[in-house]
Structures are given as structure tokens and as C-alpha cells.
Design a protein with these regions (language model features):
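Extracellular/periplasmic ectodomains of large secreted or surface enzymes and adhesion receptors
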Residues: 2-6
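Active-site-proximal segments of catalytic enzyme domains
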Residues: 7-9, 18, 58, 82
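Extracellular beta-strand-rich solenoid/capping regions of secreted or surface-exposed proteins
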Residues: 10-24, 44
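Short, recurring structural edge motifs at helix starts
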Residues: 16-19, 68-72, 93-95, 114-120, ...
Length: 220
């Protein structure tokens, strides 16, 4: 919990990031509740890999609602897994940063009362999987963000949405060699990427867990 001035609902003179990791590998963040942080619950930097964040809840952020605030679960690393996490009143609830090498997976995550889109908030964060990610009140964006944050341009390529929901799901492909896709997704759908079974259910329910079971067996 980040201690703040209770009389100021937009106080920022308190802790911004709860967990900030860099130069780290083979780590876990598990079953943590985060409250009142202005920036991130978990912020994984470029030199992080093979990190799992699971079963965490972040809510009641205290901050302004612009800039780089409330990027709640964000990775700039590679081979990171964020699963079964909940973010409330975040701006970018589940996000990847500038040129995150990937692959990075967000699996069975929920954004409640979201104030901004989830997806990559930086340029060319390739190899994202959004698998059963539900964003209440905002969007999931795989597209050209143009001048967002000083000229982000294309935010991702070779990425996939699988059974996701949101206000609007933007899924565009930069070109024929860098294709994004969306399968079994619900909401207002837009983009030139590959779409299958839109506003319908697909099997398996979770692509990530199906591949994990195939690789490791049901005990995984």
C-alpha cells in the first residue's frame, strides 16, 4: 500500500511503483494486493526475462490521470507471463513498453473501470499474446498509434488476441510479413488483421493453457 494524503484524491507525493524489476531472471510475483500506487503495480524493465506475475490485484490508484501514470502491469522484458491479475481504475492496465523483445503473455486478466487502452504503449513490442483479457470500459489496441506519446507509430507486430473483450478491439497488421490476429473476440472490432470467429466462442478456451498442457501434461 502506498501511503498518501487522504484529503487529496490526486496526490502524487507518494510511492509510484510497487515492484520495479531489472537485471532479473526466473522470478515470481504472486498473490499480492496493490493499493493507491500512482504508477505501476509491477514494472518489468528491459533486462528482465522468464518472470511470472500471477493472482495479483491492483486498485484504488491515487494520481492524476495522464502521462505515464497507472501503467499497472507493464513489461519491457521478454518471456514474461502475467496471468489471473485484476486492475481497477488503471489507464493502461496490461501493457508492453518500447521495443519489448517478447514473447510476452497476458492470460486471463481483468481490467475494471479502465481509463485507457491495453496493449503496447511503445513502439514495436512484438510477440504479444492477450489470452482471455477482458477490459471493462476501454480498448485493446494492436495498431499504429501515430503521434501518441511523442510518435509511437506501430505498437506491435506478430501478436495475437485470443477470446478477449473490450469496448473496441483494434487489430491491424503493419504489413504482410508482420501480421497480427484476433480469434473469438467480442466487442466493436476494427482493423485489417486476421479475424476468425468474431463475437463467438472458440476452442480451446485458452490458447496459452492448451499449449502448456500439450507441452507439460495436465498436471501443469
Amino acid at each position: 500500500m502506498s501511503e498518501h494524503n487522504s484529503w487529496n484524491p490526486k496526490d502524487e507525493d507518494h510511492c509510484w511503483d510497487a515492484i520495479w524489476a531489472d537485471n532479473a531472471r526466473d522470478c515470481w510475483v504472486r498473490r499480492v494486493e496493490f493499493r493507491h500506487f500512482a504508477g505501476s503495480a509491477v514494472n518489468l524493465q528491459k533486462q528482465t526475462s522468464r518472470i511470472t506475475v500471477e493472482d495479483c490485484i491492483a486498485g484504488e490508484p491515487v494520481s492524476e490521470t495522464g502521462g505515464w501514470r497507472r501503467c499497472v502491469f507493464i513489461t519491457r522484458g521478454q518471456q514474461t507471463l502475467i496471468q489471473r491479475c485484476v486492475s481497477r481504475q488503471g489507464i493502461h492496465d496490461f501493457a508492453a513498453g518500447f521495443c519489448a523483445a517478447g514473447p510476452n503473455a497476458f492470460v486471463q486478466c481483468e481490467g475494471e473501470n479502465s481509463l485507457g487502452f491495453s496493449g503496447s504503449i511503445g513502439s514495436w513490442a512484438a510477440g504479444l499474446l492477450f489470452d482471455i483479457v477482458n477490459i471493462d470500459g476501454n480498448d485493446i489496441s494492436f495498431k499504429n498509434l501515430e503521434q501518441f506519446q511523442f510518435g509511437t507509430g506501430w505498437n506491435t507486430a506478430n501478436s495475437m488476441m485470443w477470446q478477449c473483450t473490450g469496448s473496441t478491439l483494434y487489430c491491424y497488421s503493419p504489413d504482410s510479413d508482420n501480421r497480427n490476429s484476433a480469434h473469438g473476440c467480442w466487442g466493436t472490432l476494427t482493423g485489417n488483421a486476421e479475424w476468425t470467429s468474431s463475437n463467438d466462442h472458440v476452442q480451446p478456451r485458452s490458447l496459452f493453457y492448451a499449449q502448456l498442457e500439450k507441452r507439460m501434461g495436465k498436471e501443469a
